[in-house]
């Protein structure tokens, strides 16, 4: 299996604690616009079917689902899927799958589009994960991906600062939410 159990459990806990329900709607819509502004909506066929790989809380799916016929929301974390189901309960065109990127039950070559934002770099073999996603797409179908960059070419001090901020982020994520 091409996933890290600790990462899956950690993000499941984070999505459960911070389910995006208190985030300002205008802020979420602006974030969606920044990520999806280059997505080629106009090339999608009528009644498109696609996937959100690593859907988390469903924050992107809530904006994509109204534009498509069917959206497959995939996540390896049951906790994340529970949050996504709750957040997307009014979207009757979302189908939820608990699966890792390499065992997704979508047929190869069947999807009109796909996206995975901020997810695949957390998978042990990122290249294999990307290949698994692309394999699900019809020929020429668009796939929007956002990967965090590698620290390989960064100086040691930069990596140390990042580690401190990451530890701080993890600690804050575990604080109780009022």
What spans do the regions from the language model cover?
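A short glycine-rich, Lys/Arg-flanked "PGG" loop and its adjoining helix->strand segment in the class I
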Residues: 127-139
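Conserved class I S-adenosyl-L-methionine
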Residues: 142-174
